[in-house]
């Protein structure tokens, strides 16, 4: 059985490393990108099984734009997306669209507890 490949798209290297340190010891392969454009390139190159995606990166709602672009591509629209953000604690919270506006498979607020992250990743990969 091959390892599931997880793409983490976040401009915070500390968060990316924390996710890597949580997932890799549990049998996952982790690749990363620092913004939406780089993330889309990694989706094409790496064919991840799951994308963990921050909302706000190089621009406000950069992650939402990436998720929309993934949904527009038939080869990528079936890849589950777990959205993570600290947006609930910022002035941008009012800009966050409803679930009807974007297609994501799960949402977690930062900071994310390792146990919760592992549970959500496993659930999304085995749905």
Protein language model features and the residues they cover:
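Short amphipathic alpha-helix used as the core "switch/output" element in two-component signaling
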Residues: 41, 64-77
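Non-catalytic signal-transmission and effector/linker regions of two-component phosphorelay proteins
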Residues: 1-7, 113-127
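Active-site beta3 strand of CheY-like receiver
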Residues: 46-53, 57, 81
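Helix N-cap/capping motif at the beta->alpha junctions
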Residues: 32-41, 62-63
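Short acidic/polar segment at the start of the alpha1 helix of CheY-like receiver
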Residues: 12-16, 114
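Charged docking surfaces used in two-component/phosphorelay signaling
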Residues: 17-25
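Alpha4 helix (beta4-alpha4-beta5 surface) of REC/receiver domains from two-component response regulators
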Residues: 61-65, 88-108, 115, 119
């Amino acid at each position: 059985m091959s390892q599931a490949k997880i793409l983490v798209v976040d401009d915070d290297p500390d968060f990316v490393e924390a996710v890597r340190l949580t997932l890799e010891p549990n049998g996952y392969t982790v690749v990363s990108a620092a913004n939406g454009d780089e993330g889309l390139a990694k989706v094409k190159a790496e064919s991840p099984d799951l994308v963990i995606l921050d909302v706000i990166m190089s621009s406000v709602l950069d992650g939402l734009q990436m998720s929309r672009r993934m949904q527009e591509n038939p080869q990528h629209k079936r890849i589950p997306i777990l959205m993570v953000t600290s947006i609930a604690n910022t002035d941008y919270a009012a800009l966050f669209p409803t679930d009807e506006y974007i297609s994501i498979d799960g949402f977690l607020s930062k900071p994310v507890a390792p146990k919760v992250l592992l549970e959500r990743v496993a659930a999304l990969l085995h749905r």
